[in-house]
Amino acid sequence: MRSDVDRWEEKYRDATAVPSLISDPLLVHYADLLKGDGLALDLAAGTCHTSVQLARLGRQVVALDCSLTALQIGQRIAAREGVRIQGLVADLDNWPLPQSTFEVITCFRYLNRELFPAMGNALKPGGLLLYKTFNQHHLREVPRFNPNYLLRPGELARSFPDLELVVCRDGVNAREPYSFAIARSPQKT
């Protein structure tokens, strides 16, 4: 993982300005589901665009990423937008997610299949997971992309068997290079 960290640090160090906030259409479309004041975790947060959006919806946000530089950029974006987020530098390959802690977990453009069970377990009962990443159709746009980091059609719908799927677009449309799912942790009975 160290070489991955170095690669991401280098990428973000080369950024000369704090970027404008980019709102992912998925967050905008499903904002009503994500509103609230509970704790949210943004995995592989990068420069924290998703984290800032969640904070704007009222959430207390922990932005987790392997790149300190990216999180520092994210803190500046948050300050400019008038919200607070907590940045946490961690290697997702070695950082255990705490169980039953978060009301919302987001993960955009990062694929580590081994984390799928831990993501579901980290949700409080009734909590929401919002997951979006590249699928195999992304190879049409970026042929050299490593296919190990791409979801296969139908894979995402099967990846969180203990959660209830609220909505899932799972790569069946060849023109969509992303798959996404929103899933809910079961309520305790």
Located regions from the model:
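Conserved SAM-binding strand-loop segment of SAM-dependent methyltransferases
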Residues: 81-92
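Core SAM-dependent methyltransferase catalytic element
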Residues: 171-189
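A short acidic, Gly/Pro-enriched loop at the edge of an enzyme's catalytic core
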Residues: 97-104
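Conserved SAM-binding loop
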Residues: 74-75
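Conserved class I S-adenosyl-L-methionine
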Residues: 1-35, 37-46
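Conserved SAM/SAH-binding beta-strand->alpha-helix loop
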Residues: 67-69
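Conserved beta-strand signature within the Rossmann-like core of class I S-adenosyl-L-methionine
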Residues: 127-134
